[in-house]
């Protein structure tokens, strides 16, 4: 109550922050007349003047008013668009590393130019991250004219371009690209063998467009680069035939809230029996150690049948299972679910199974974007997730006021008892709008539901366009013309974000498409006049009919997705309306207490085809959505705690790789490792507290032969006077040193340096790949520790640290072993072998952005609180060798993760 009174007196935090920016906006406006008087060349010269001032010690904040004024003036001249005051505020928010929430149609693309220009002046690069290639290319071409006019270079990163083009794009002052491409380039760079091959510069500043989609919706989906494994595909078909013989509830239970499926006790017995009959089980039970691989196959097959539906989660196209993006409804060709789930779906649909893949490198979007020195975001819908952005990413959400007041009419939800009643009402609503010339956009949650709406419209003979994963080729065109009179567009999960729906249609697109390029100039002019006249008439008709009408056919789990759909109407003060039609058979209503509501509606005497409309219903639905959002937030928070463990290890390995590539001569490093390995072998076989007569001389001799290719007569040492543990160490080291020097003399120092570096990198990559597989296995079963009253997160941290310590030890041992045994005649052989390795790896690599696995079981077992999360702004300090290791082991850095360094 007191907080509400305080807000009335002093305004909200958002209001106070916006007021604090007004003096900056006034300073920018005050420069407008001065910059209008400049010639084009004088305006361009301002960029070079700003760069010179930065070099002399001024900061970007010092330059902000002048830089923004220059961009505004440049935009007026090149694009014919002037930044409004609210857009200047949006630009300041982005520069300060916050999230700018701007409603649809308020010009986010133009807003980004302000802070991108300012931050690019440092020469360290500025990235604009979008959700698809179309938007990246469109915005880079469109806004690129402005940057180039002001003397800055622009690059674009899209799928399928070569490394040379990528490097040039990253070296540009401003780079546009998709979240996936930025992530995969980061991973690929950390698999390269030389610094020259790497395409990215250090990550400096990024603006993430549709930041809610990338940092919230896709937070549980890691980017994975994988290669093929040797696993047989026959097992998937054989196991798949058994699953239809199981009964739901009796043999397995499906928890839709937790998105998990588990066998009952009877189900475990039944599947074991079926597998024995099919000859798939070796001796013993399904859960015996030697059958553990089959558990993986059975679990994925059950998940494929019970949790995944064709035309909702995936479609079968050209004999392949193609994932459908849950949030956009788009197809994701080339993307595959990991851990054998995609193979299980292929077996279920009886298409050719592609080999299961093994992870070579992976990263989540949270950890990718935390690598930037400064991060900002923009979206039309972030406020509902403001708490999550603040607590996980330390990103504050600032709501930017609209340039014109919103006049859209949002109706209360209408709730029907059955799906059929609801769809009939939707079709009737569309018919009313269609007859008065009003354009309608219908939002559905799946391909199946969009086909059902289409079926009802066909009965009423209403022409319409369908936009979903099956009809994605014309996406931009369909969305752009969805504002024409009588246009009816059915869209799954509002594909087409980023493309404005303009009332009357998109004039530019019509001119480009309908004017005949082969006609005479006079005819083309006549055609243009006719199209412009039609456009003005269409726009007037749509405005008179009430603007764009939005119909939601179901509430999404997230209020934000619903708000995105609503936000397509009422852009820039245009009229518009929206309403949601619900039924008790909808997923959200069914999962969250529809039985109780069904009984209540029957008591109220609700007849077939009647709907209940009341603000209380809206509140009940919103309450259900908040529950889901809260649960999903907890899952994402828990996932991030688990992923942070992996992230620390990844940073250590990637930093180590880069250090190896930066140094031409790693001889001292190799000598240090050799000494460590020799000392460890002596300590293990010729103990300090053991008499020489009791030494394991035979074991030590074999170990030295295996590790260094050296045959030492250790037996004779035992009988020599005065030979101690320390003397044995010195002798072994002297022998190793002499052998290494002899090899170097034979091969020559340049080749030896090349070999040391090359072998070190190859061993590190091979063992890191194995380590990722071990970490995947650890992750899969860790949540079960909760049933033994152990904290899964602490157990994961402890065992992950043990695995990582073993990895570092193995890297040292195997690198030294290879160096001792490898034989090379010519330097060209090494270079040829490396090139062959890189080529083979590139051909076999596949890029995946799957549904993430269950880090810690997605809430199963007790949850655990970890250390607070780091904000997205880094101080960039390097860990000192004598400081505590950041992985939390309690050891010094040089004795733990820094051991390789």
UniProtKB/Swiss-Prot annotation:
Catalytic activity annotation: ATP + H2O + cellular proteinSide 1 = ADP + phosphate + cellular proteinSide 2
Segments of this protein annotated with the region Disordered: 847-901
This enzyme's EC code(s): 7.4.2.8
Family stated for the protein in its record: Belongs to the SecA family.
PANTHER family membership: CHLOROPLAST PROTEIN-TRANSPORTING ATPASE, SECA INNER MEMBRANE COMPONENT OF SEC PROTEIN SECRETION SYSTEM
Assembly and interaction partners: Monomer and homodimer. Part of the essential Sec protein translocation apparatus which comprises SecA, SecYEG and auxiliary proteins SecDF-YajC and YidC.
Cofactor: binding comment: May bind 1 zinc ion per subunit.
Protein's GO biological process: intracellular protein transmembrane transport; protein import; protein targeting; protein transport by the Sec complex
Keyword Transmembrane applies: no
Segments forming a coiled coil: none
Keywords: ATP-binding, Cell inner membrane, Cell membrane, Cytoplasm, Membrane, Metal-binding, Nucleotide-binding, Protein transport, Translocase, Translocation, Transport, Zinc
Binding site for Zn(2+): 885, 887, 896-897
Residues engaged in binding ATP: 87, 105-109, 500
Any one of the GO CC terms: plasma membrane
Cell cycle found in the keyword field: no
Protein name: Protein translocase subunit SecA 1
Function: Part of the Sec protein translocase complex. Interacts with the SecYEG preprotein conducting channel. Has a central role in coupling the hydrolysis of ATP to the transfer of proteins into and across the cell membrane, serving both as a receptor for the preprotein-SecB complex and as an ATP-driven molecular motor driving the stepwise translocation of polypeptide chains across the membrane.
Membrane topology, record value: Peripheral membrane protein
Essential cofactor(s): Zn(2+)
A molecular-function term among this protein's GO annotations: ATP binding
Compartment(s) of residence: Cell inner membrane; Cytoplasm
